[in-house]
């Protein structure tokens, strides 16, 4: 799971390295308490670079704070896959009741 997580103070270049290592084109952004506060994709990184945001900048201005997620307790795999396909989504994290990634 660690390869999918970055914190809000992570630099853009470090987040990009995680995206490259996990080979999934996204990361889940967590706060100091380990709760998910957003997601970030390789596309978000590209758009930041095109806006001349420095690679050393932290991701706080870049990641998506309004994100869709599945609740672990209510997860139905078929419905989840159908939702992703219907909404042309490549990814949505699964969070527990404390909003921690699982």
Where are these predicted regions, by residue range?
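General secondary-structure edge motif
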Residues: 13, 25, 42, 63-64
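Short beta->alpha transition motifs characteristic of CBS
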Residues: 21, 28, 36-51, 93, ...
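Short beta-to-alpha loop/turn elements within the nucleotide-binding domains of ABC transporters
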Residues: 10, 40, 57
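The conserved cystathionine-beta-synthase
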Residues: 5-24, 30, 49, 70-89, ...
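Bateman (tandem CBS) regulatory domains
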Residues: 1-4, 57-67
